[in-house]
């Protein structure tokens, strides 16, 4: 199939690019647009094959913008192959070209630069470098100011929203999701951007504990699920599983995590399967099925590789293994896992809350009720703090939404 498409596109290139230079360039633009339309969904699922096709086509192009447009998409393929150094290197070539030729075809340069910085932001997110990701994504949005069309702007706003969600800044997260929704409405684009926006808003409201609103957005997104890539379906299934985990509907959570697990079978990066296997392991602990829990936790640890040694992640996984040990009444192992020394500024307060609850359970099982009470009080204190923070985030998100809605109202007037 790949060789047929290369031959077919080569034929189109010969037909479309013969004649005067302007006709040749128009033909190249049509060729590249056709190529990207054909391989849009294959970049994630067959990235190496797509690199071969794009590279073969680039070698015959005369227009530099078309050349670097394909190269920009190749950088995404390296990301999907989990070759992050190569993804950054190729992405850097595209950005350098755009910045050196800023006065050329300004509109096309802006669109390409916006796409390149959007890719770079996603790469930084993958590495957990959120400050660098935010900087790149804001550069992407700035690059598209005045560009026509701005079809990638909703995607940039979704990525910005996701960055702020990871930072725990839910007000700015909600702001950018709603900006993405406004842009999608104004551009009149297809279902895919709406799916990402609705899924993201569902995750946001799950984090805020507003489960009715979260469920509403999940249902909106689910109606569009068939039109999306495997990665987008994975994100939806894993997020839906987390929703049911938070509402304590563990059988439903298990169903959705298993769906996510099946989707990751075709992914070249082990990270996604590692995440969902961690979720499956924790869910089986809550369902009091220790053998299944151990299977998935052990496999998650294997799949995470070097990431397992990062303090924040190790603290989280040690906590899950401690829960498993408590379930099996292996109190010495549970105590050893819960007694590790970590720098608290590197640890999510939610995980500290869970570990204090585990310590309370441990000492209750040991008959040391005084210590069990002390750890219960510490857990309650963190829980109160987290609840207050959630309320503040909810109020801030409502305030942002209100200000956006009233701004639109004034424009309509």
What residues fall within each predicted segment?
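Bacterial Sec-dependent N-terminal signal peptides
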Residues: 1-42, 64, 74, 98, ...
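Hydrophobic positions within repeat-based interaction scaffolds
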Residues: 27, 31-33, 48, 85-88, ...
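Conserved alpha-helical positions within TPR/SEL1-like repeat arrays
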Residues: 39-40, 72-80, 111-126, 151-166, ...
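Flexible helix-coil transition and linker loops at the boundaries of alpha-helical arrays
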Residues: 57-66, 97-110, 144-150, 184-191, ...
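N-terminal leader/linker segments that initiate helical-solenoid repeat arrays
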Residues: 17-73, 80-89, 96, 100, ...
């Amino acid at each position: 199939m790949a060789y047929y498409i290369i031959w077919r596109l080569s034929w189109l290139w010969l037909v479309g690019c013969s004649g005067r230079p302007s006709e040749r360039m128009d033909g190249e633009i049509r060729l590249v647009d056709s190529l990207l339309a054909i391989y849009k969904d294959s970049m994630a699922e067959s990235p190496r094959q797509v690199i071969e096709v794009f590279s073969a086509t680039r070698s015959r192009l005369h227009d530099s913008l078309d050349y670097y447009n394909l190269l920009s998409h190749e950088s995404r393929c390296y990301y999907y192959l989990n070759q992050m150094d190569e993804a950054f290197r190729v992405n850097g070539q595209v950005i350098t070209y755009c910045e050196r030729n800023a006065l050329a075809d300004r509109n096309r340069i802006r669109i390409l630069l916006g796409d390149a910085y959007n890719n770079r932001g996603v790469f930084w997110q993958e590495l957990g470098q959120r400050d660098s990701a935010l900087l790149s994504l804001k550069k992407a949005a700035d690059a598209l100011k005045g560009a026509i069309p701005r079809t990638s702007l909703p995607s940039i706003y979704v990525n910005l929203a996701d960055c702020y969600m990871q930072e725990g800044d839910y007000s700015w997260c909600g702001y950018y999701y709603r900006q993405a929704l406004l842009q999608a409405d104004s551009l009149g684009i297809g279902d895919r951007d709406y799916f990402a926006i609705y899924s993201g808003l569902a995750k946001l409201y799950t984090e805020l504990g507003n489960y009715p609103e979260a469920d509403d957005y999940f249902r909106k997104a689910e109606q569009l699920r068939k039109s999306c890539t495997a990665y987008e379906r994975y994100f939806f299934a894993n997020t839906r599983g987390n929703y049911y985990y938070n509402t304590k509907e563990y059988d439903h959570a298990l169903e959705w995590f298993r769906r996510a697990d099946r989707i990751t079978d075709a992914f070249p990066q082990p990270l996604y399967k590692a995440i969902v296997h961690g979720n499956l392991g924790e869910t089986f602990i809550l369902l009091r099925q220790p053998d299944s829990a151990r299977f998935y936790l052990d496999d998650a640890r294997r799949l995470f590789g070097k990431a397992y040694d990062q303090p924040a992640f190790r603290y989280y996984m040690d906590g899950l293994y401690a829960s498993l040990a408590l379930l099996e009444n292996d109190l010495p192992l549970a105590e050893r896992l819960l007694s590790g020394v970590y720098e608290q500024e590197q640890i999510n307060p939610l995980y500290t809350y869970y570990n204090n609850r585990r310590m309370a359970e441990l000492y209750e099982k040991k008959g040391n009720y005084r210590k069990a009470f002390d750890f219960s009080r510490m857990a309650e204190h963190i829980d109160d703090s987290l609840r207050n923070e959630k309320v503040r985030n909810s109020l801030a998100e409502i305030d942002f939404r209100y200000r956006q809605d009233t701004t639109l109202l004034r424009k309509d007037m």
